[in-house]
């Protein structure tokens, strides 16, 4: 009888150990951990996606000082926009050129040194849209390399699976659910950001498949509505490139339209018990500045009212909050994002 009791105790102890080990291996840090991470993300900005530093560090626009300036301005995170496909030749293993990792490490370390959270964003939506199944193997292989390379970074670094996956929901769900365990295997405690089809649009949250038994997840949405305002004059936007002079005034109807969209997202967030990050929002420079300021401020405040983190699009290149030519902030946009206390 005593032997049976001891044996049962050993079995119970082993079972408990295995349960704890398994939970740890799946990144289990408590169901509220992703919400804690999202709160820490706070306010942020997209950086370095179109900076020549990826190919030639001597031509970099982004410097170490800019990470410090971002933090001092009141931002809490940077979304590192990376496009790794061009750093690999099509092959069996899609080995990534070490030059890519040199730049990625530099950016991550500069951000962390300035106490900024980091979202490592896989920004290959154009290639994935053109041939999602044909590029799937490359996406999986490259994420495996990046996940292994970054596995020792602290939990202040997050992974985002693929920006704006413009494809059928069934195809994207299958791809995203193949990437997810690759990331989780090498990074059991890292928060992973999931993406939503067709521009990370709120209306497609309902189409998103979620991993089972893993709550260390944040879901990314993007917001550029009304698109005729935010993308007027944008040369890549076929329907809006010839538009001009469209203003955004904070009328009750205009504000209510944004609130209604955000309420749909918030309802989804509550129903699925997952936090949201507004990974992109902004109005292109061809819109008038007063309208851009009003819209940007309103969108940011509405996101914060729902406890979402956000990352403005973007620091440099277009939609800018920082002018590299003059090496100074675009103050109306910066102040719309981070109002004076």
Give short role names for the model-derived ranges.
Residues 10-20:
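Bacterial N-terminal signal peptides
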Residues 25-77, 94-95, 268-269:
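N-terminal carbohydrate-binding accessory modules
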Residues 47-62, 84-97, 230-257:
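Acidic/histidine-rich helix-loop elements
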Residues 53-58, 84-101, 123-138, 291, ...:
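Surface-exposed, active-site-proximal loop segments in enzymatic domains
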Residues 67-76, 95-122, 129-158, 174-186, ...:
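An active-site-proximal structural segment forming one wall of the substrate-binding cleft
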Residues 140-254, 259-283, 305-308:
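Active-site region of glycoside hydrolase catalytic domains
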Residues 288-341:
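Aromatic-rich peripheral "rim/lid" segments of glycoside hydrolase catalytic domains that contact
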């Amino acid at each position: 009888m005593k032997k049976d009791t001891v044996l049962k105790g050993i079995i119970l102890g082993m079972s408990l150990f295995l349960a704890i080990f398994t939970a740890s291996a799946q990144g289990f840090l408590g169901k509220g951990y992703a919400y804690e991470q999202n709160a820490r993300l706070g306010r942020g900005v997209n950086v370095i996606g179109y900076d020549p530093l990826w190919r030639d560090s001597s031509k970099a626009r982004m410097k170490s000082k800019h990470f410090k300036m971002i933090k001092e301005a009141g931002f809490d995170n940077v979304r590192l926009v990376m496009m790794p496909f061009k750093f690999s030749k099509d092959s069996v293993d899609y080995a990534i050129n070490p030059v890519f990792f040199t730049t990625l490490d530099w950016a991550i370390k500069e951000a962390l040194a300035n106490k900024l959270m980091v979202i490592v964003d896989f920004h290959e939506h154009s290639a994935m849209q053109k041939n999602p199944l044909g590029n799937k193997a490359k996406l999986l292989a490259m994420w495996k390399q990046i996940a292994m390379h970054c596995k020792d970074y602290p939990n202040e670094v997050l992974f985002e699976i693929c920006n704006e996956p413009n494809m059928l929901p069934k195809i994207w769900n299958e791809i995203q659910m193949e990437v997810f365990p690759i990331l989780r295997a090498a990074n059991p405690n890292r928060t992973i950001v999931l993406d939503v089809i067709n521009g990370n649009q709120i209306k497609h949250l309902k189409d998103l498949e979620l991993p089972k038994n893993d709550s260390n997840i944040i879901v990314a949405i993007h917001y550029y509505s009304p698109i005729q305002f935010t993308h007027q004059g944008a040369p890549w936007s076929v329907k809006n490139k010839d538009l001009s002079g469209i203003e955004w005034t904070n009328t009750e109807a205009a504000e209510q339209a944004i609130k209604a969209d955000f309420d749909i997202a918030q309802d989804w967030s509550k129903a699925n018990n997952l936090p949201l990050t507004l990974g992109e929002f902004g109005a292109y420079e061809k819109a008038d500045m007063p309208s851009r300021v009003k819209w940007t401020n309103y969108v940011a405040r509405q996101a914060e009212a729902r406890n979402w983190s956000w990352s403005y699009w973007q620091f440099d290149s277009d939609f800018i909050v920082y002018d590299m030519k003059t090496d100074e902030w675009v103050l109306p946009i910066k102040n719309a994002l981070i109002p004076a206390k």
